């Protein structure tokens, strides 16, 4: 049996150009990000979107932020669920609306920039820039330009970093636990 003190654990990022290149978000706090990317299969589940929306609620992103739901089901849930992962009631904002209000660019579900693609791919890095992303790989050229630097992080860390324009520990923006209801539970 292993016991972990989750309160003592720090959010991690993977520096370019390998998922194994681990560091804490705190140690990377001076890294400016030109773009934030939330989504694809790894960071595009409905719970990921709920976490990001709770960080971004009532705020505006500083770094251009691209959101790609991991499936059409997640996209539909983003439109129909509130920030607690429950069915949206009249007058409540949906996860989608919250992300949109924060200034995020929301695309269709799919891989999008996670695997680069042609120059017009949604969220693709077409020039050397620094991106913080919820995707699962950060090898040179993976999200587009071979000289782009991609940091991998959780949806919470990516959302917090989108707000500040630099890699940011999301605990600065979370004051209470984020509930996801039964969202994402099959």
Where are these regions (language model features)?
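Fe-S-dependent hydro-lyases/dehydratases of central metabolism
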Residues: 1-186
